[in-house]
Amino acid sequence: MNLPSPAPPTLVLASSSPYRAELLARLGLPFEICAPDIDETPLPQEQPEGLVARLAETKARVVGAKSPNALVIGSDQVAVLGQQILGKPKTHERALQQLRAASGQTVFFYTGLCLVNTLMGEAKTVVEPFQVQFRQLTEQQIDNYLQREQPYQCAGSFRSEGLGIALIQHLQGDDPNALVGLPLIRLTELLEQAGYPVL
């Protein structure tokens, strides 16, 4: 007598970000969305790479606790200018300050990605860096961009997939999707390692 094969795991995106959902949809896999409710405050002396890795895993584990047979994707991103972490500005004034500071400078974006296999209790976490060289921007250009794009929920006040491309002089990194918030190249690798091939 043949035993029934186990049900495949459910793919779950632990995010409220429409941008991440849009990126994940590009892989053509069925998935569910469950927004995590976590404290995203950095720990004392926490470095950017450690912060995004911790938050990505925390998001995936919090959502995974409700799903007994799932592959849960958590992701988090920060932008770093010099020694300062640029989070989501949330207001127009904060976004103005961030983009004034970024004008003519190099900003490093770090995207943490975690895949939790709830059946096995395993988590794999990676951090994908990306470097953005901003053009010298006038006050008028910054204001025009913010009025049109309103990137107040985006790390560093910047959306590369939209009008934000007009702010950029140069990009450097392995996966442009990481800038939007979900590194699909690394995610494909993690899914395949978990026995969930994309192709």
UniProtKB/Swiss-Prot annotation:
Its cofactor is a divalent metal cation. Keywords: Cytoplasm, Hydrolase, Nucleotide metabolism. Its EC number is 3.6.1.-. It catalyses: N(7)-methyl-GTP + H2O = N(7)-methyl-GMP + diphosphate + H(+). It comes from the Bacteria. It is found in: Cytoplasm. The keyword Cytoplasm applies. CDD domains: Maf (cd00555). Gene3D superfamilies: 3.90.950.10. The record marks 19, 77, 161 as: Important for substrate specificity. Its main location: cytoplasm. One of its GO terms (biological process) is nucleotide metabolic process. One of its GO terms (cellular component) is cytoplasm. The active site is at 76 (proton acceptor). One of its GO terms (molecular function) is nucleoside triphosphate diphosphatase activity. Nucleoside triphosphate pyrophosphatase that hydrolyzes 7-methyl-GTP (m(7)GTP). May have a dual role in cell division arrest and in preventing the incorporation of modified nucleotides into cellular nucleic acids. NCBIfam families: maf (TIGR00172). Belongs to the Maf family. YceF subfamily. HAMAP family: Maf. This is 7-methyl-GTP pyrophosphatase. It comes from Nitrosococcus oceani (strain ATCC 19707 / BCRC 17464 / JCM 30415 / NCIMB 11848 / C-107). The lineage of its organism: Bacteria, Pseudomonadati, Pseudomonadota, Gammaproteobacteria, Chromatiales.
